[in-house]
Amino acid sequence: CAKKRNWCGKTEDCCCPMKCVYAWYNEQGSCQSTISALWKKC
């Protein structure tokens, strides 16, 4: 997993929750799923 403040470049990146959680929270990433859904998908 990359640094937690990195953006989600691809849907697969969201399989690393802490990589994208901050970007998702700030609506900076391309992941639009909820955090709980990220865990379930991966």
From Swiss-Prot:
Compartments in which it is found: Secreted
Protein name: Delta-hexatoxin-Hv1a
Principal subcellular localisation of the protein: secreted
Keyword Disulfide bond listed: yes
Stated role: Inhibits tetrodotoxin-sensitive voltage-gated sodium channels (Nav) by binding to site 3. Slows the inactivation, and causes a prolongation of action potential duration resulting in repetitive firing in autonomic and motor nerve fibers. Does not depolarize the resting potential. Does not affect tetrodotoxin-resistant sodium channels. This lethal neurotoxin is active on both insect and mammalian voltage-gated sodium channels.
Lineage: Eukaryota, Metazoa, Ecdysozoa, Arthropoda, Chelicerata
Keywords, in A-Z order: Disulfide bond, Ion channel impairing toxin, Knottin, Neurotoxin, Secreted, Toxin, Voltage-gated sodium channel impairing toxin
A GO cellular component entry from the record: extracellular region
Further comment found in the protein's record: Is the sole lethal toxin in male and female A.versutus venom.
GO molecular-function term, one example from the UniProt record: sodium channel inhibitor activity
Record organism: Hadronyche versuta
Tissue: Expressed by the venom gland.
Family in the record: Belongs to the neurotoxin 06 (delta-actx) family.
Transmembrane segments: none
Description of its domains: The presence of a 'disulfide through disulfide knot' structurally defines this protein as a knottin.
SUPFAM superfamilies the record matches: omega toxin-like
Cysteine pairings via disulfide bonds: 1-15, 8-20, 14-31, 16-42
